[in-house]
């Protein structure tokens, strides 16, 4: 099993944390508001601990469960405290009208995180194509991208421990397109599907 630290105390932190505890992983919760972190840790149970904001995380895998515009600044703020860790960015940088990405260049939040993280840190993009309520109700495919092979093995094993299927889409540059998939998911929720209780996945056909 894995040891993870959740930076953030919102809905996605709660959803991932719940599955992580159920999967037998060691979980730490960290938030700017210590009382919210304490409350989430107690709600998750399973020996979940509370960390100190900015301190070295307990988890080998650090999940930044934050709004997109806070991810890069927080990673920069943590600095060397994240050395040797695997950072998992789950954010979606949607624009204000939810019909485009907030950045115009062919980049991603995960790629920008890699620029400010310590050189010994690996960055993986994952979970951004899944709505919180889907994690609570179902077992969707989890697309992920990253450059470090061992980091992807570790993240894949963690995803599997949640009862989900990890699907590797390639190097970290693919994180840009995963963010685009997140946007497509929102478009489907508002149009073709018409509700939020679904997830994108892969169906394989033989013969």
Give residue ranges: language-model regions.
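Rossmann-fold NAD(P)-binding glycine/threonine-rich loop
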Residues: 91-133
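NAD(P)+-binding Rossmann beta1-loop-alpha1 motif at the extreme N-terminus of oxidoreductases
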Residues: 1-43
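Hydrophobic Val/Ile/Leu positions in short beta-strands of Rossmann-like dinucleotide-binding domains
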Residues: 5-6, 64, 144
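Active-site-lining helix/loop region of Rossmann-like oxidoreductase modules
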Residues: 141-207
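Rossmann-like NAD(P)-binding element
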Residues: 41, 45-86, 90-97
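Rossmann-fold NAD(P)-dependent oxidoreductase module
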Residues: 15, 19, 116, 158
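Active-site phosphate/pyrophosphate- and oxyanion-stabilizing loops and adjacent acidic/basic residues
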Residues: 38, 76, 111, 115
